[in-house]
């Protein structure tokens, strides 16, 4: 028989630099992209009997909401931020669209080499990968990758950093809109 999707992965283009005259810095999502996301999310939710499928989103440049989430002392913070986040200067509303649609449980970005944290904001985990290449102009974290494990039928996931030498750090569980460190994790 035909199988239905159990989860969604959104791989999106957050662009590179601003294309708006007079606004410097990094790019952001366009309204067309946000509309595309909302349409896909609504279609999958409708096909699933009105219940949003659990989803993860991946793109390069952090959303502006990362900054406030990391700096909020009431949030649980797991990982490191050895530099400031570098989102685009304008906030087009992609995070609001994800909160309203109800499917995305985690957003993972890169771009900033010295950040690898995970923090929850409005029921969505906001996380960074880990710098995985060789030396660049800056990278104070050890090279590694962020791994994610989804469990079918659950609206959550586990994630951790696997460093190049095999060391596992910051094993995190995301359930019910909250992150927590898994016991026996560095």
Predicted regions and their residues:
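Binuclear metal-dependent phosphoesterase catalytic core
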Residues: 1-4, 94-96, 115-186
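Active-site-proximal beta-strand elements of phosphoester/diester hydrolases
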Residues: 6-16, 58, 124-131
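His/acidic metal-ligating clusters that form di-metal
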Residues: 8-11, 23-116
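Serine/threonine-rich low-complexity intrinsically disordered regions
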Residues: 19-20, 72, 176
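Short, solvent-exposed loop/turn segments at secondary-structure boundaries
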Residues: 22-25, 138-140
């Amino acid at each position: 028989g035909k199988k239905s999707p159990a989860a969604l992965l959104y791989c999106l283009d957050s662009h590179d630099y601003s294309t708006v005259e007079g606004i410097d810095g990094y790019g952001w999502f366009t309204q067309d992209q946000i509309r595309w996301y909302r349409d896909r999310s609504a279609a999958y939710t409708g096909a699933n009997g009105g219940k949003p499928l659990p989803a993860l989103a991946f793109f390069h440049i952090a959303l502006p909401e990362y900054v406030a989430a990391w700096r909020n002392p009431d949030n649980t913070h797991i990982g490191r931020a050895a530099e400031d986040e570098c989102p685009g200067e304008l906030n087009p509303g992609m995070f609001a669209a994800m909160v309203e649609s109800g499917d995305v449980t985690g957003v993972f970005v890169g771009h900033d080499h010295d950040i690898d944290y995970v923090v929850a904001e409005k029921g969505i985990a906001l996380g960074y990968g880990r710098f995985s290449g060789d030396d660049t102009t800056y990278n104070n974290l050890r090279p590694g990758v962020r791994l994610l494990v989804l469990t079918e039928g659950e609206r959550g996931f586990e994630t951790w950093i696997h460093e190049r030498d095999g060391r596992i750090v910051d094993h995190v569980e995301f359930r019910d809109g909250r992150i927590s460190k898994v016991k026996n994790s560095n």
